A protein has these predicted regions:
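Short amphipathic alpha-helix adjacent to the substrate-entry channel of hydrolases
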Residues: 123-141
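Primarily recognizes the serine-hydrolase "nucleophile elbow" in alpha/beta-hydrolase
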Residues: 159-226
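N-terminal cap/lid segment of alpha/beta-hydrolase-fold proteins
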Residues: 34, 40-104, 196
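Short beta-strand element of the alpha/beta-hydrolase
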Residues: 106-115
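C-terminal catalytic histidine-bearing segment of alpha/beta-hydrolase fold enzymes
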Residues: 2-18, 255-297
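Short beta-strand/loop motif that positions the catalytic acidic residue
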Residues: 231-233, 237
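Conserved alpha/beta-hydrolase "acid-adjacent" motif
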Residues: 238-247
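Catalytic nucleophile-loop/oxyanion-hole region of alpha/beta-hydrolase
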Residues: 121-123, 142-172, 274-279
Length: 297
């Protein structure tokens, strides 16, 4: 069993919810109701009949959604609220940071889910990753950003980083090295910030990321100043070609930038953690990559 699967199943087993639980019941949960709508894509209306087994209908660009992962994420934020932790930090009307703290002084991570810039698939593509990373000792943020276009979304990520660096003690951060993670549209966001920094997107200059971790994106832009880059994609991805990702990393390697690339068989777009697929365990490979190339991140 992969370590990420073990963590997800542990939290899923603690959940009071199940497949038949209406999404509206989760939204009304007294522990998390102040921010629960951002657990799910808030750009698309969820019919009242939708249950937690229907979440995949809200994420049309994603695949391999698992009920256990959804339950685990919800239980994690409920646990944090029971401990009186502040889970969601609003940065604007529809912009904010979920924060899963850790007890160690490891560098932190910021994760942006994808959704084609038409919705934010956090329940599948950033919050599960944040849960796993935090359980492994890495403080992790998951970004809620505005949909409607890449520029707007990247500006929201820059705002999030500027907010973190403005007062890191607010989040209990001791180590200010960090990594940027993202899936699909979120990977584009991470790559842009990794290449050009917050100062290129309306914020003061912040320290650059130590590494970028990318899932399945057709992003081709890069710079000579890119950080170490790890990328994963399915070979049957009809949205983001694995060859496009491979070529970008080849260009980074030519600049002596550390890279690692994985293309998985029998797998399409939007697989998230990839539990139950040929990509299962990729997040552990990503952690090892960063630790090898930029130290104990």
């Amino acid at each position: 069993m992969s370590e990420d699967r073990r963590i997800i199943e542990k939290y899923a087993a603690l959940s009071p919810y199940q497949a038949s639980t209406p999404i509206k019941e989760v939204l009304a949960d007294p522990l998390i109701k102040d921010f629960a709508r951002f657990l799910f894509p808030d750009d698309w209306y969820a019919p009242e009949r939708y249950t937690l087994a229907s979440v995949d209908h809200l994420l049309p660009f994603h695949s391999h959604l698992r009920l256990e992962t959804t339950l685990a994420v919800i239980e994690k934020v409920r646990e944090l609220r029971r401990l009186k932790a502040e889970v969601y930090y609003p940065l604007g009307k529809r912009v904010g940071l979920f924060y899963f703290p850790s007890s160690t002084a490891n560098p932190f991570s910021v994760i942006s889910a994808g959704g084609g810039f038409s919705y934010v698939g956090s329940i599948h593509e950033s919050l599960p990753h944040a849960l796993v990373l935090s359980e492994l000792g890495y403080p992790t943020f998951a970004l809620q950003y505005r949909s409607g276009g890449a520029r707007m979304a990247v500006e929201d990520l820059a705002l999030a980083l500027a907010t973190i660096f403005e007062d890191p003690a607010r989040f209990g951060l001791e180590n200010l090295h960090y990594t940027l993670w993202g899936g699909s549209a979120g990977a584009r966001m991470a790559a842009y910030l990794g290449s050009y920094g917050t100062e290129s997107f309306g914020q003061k200059a912040c320290p650059r990321a130590d590494a970028v971790i990318m899932e399945y994106t057709g992003h081709t832009d890069y710079s000579a100043h890119d950080p170490a880059t790890f990328a994963v994609v399915g070979k049957q991805d009809g949205i983001a070609s694995w060859r496009t990702m491979a070529r970008r990393l080849e260009r980074l390697r030519a600049l002596q930038i550390p890279t690692e690339f994985h293309a998985y068989e029998r797998l399409g777009h939007g697989f998230g953690l990839g539990i139950g697929t040929s990509a299962e365990g990729w997040i552990m490979d990503a952690i090892r990559f960063v630790e090898k190339n930029v130290g104990k991140f």
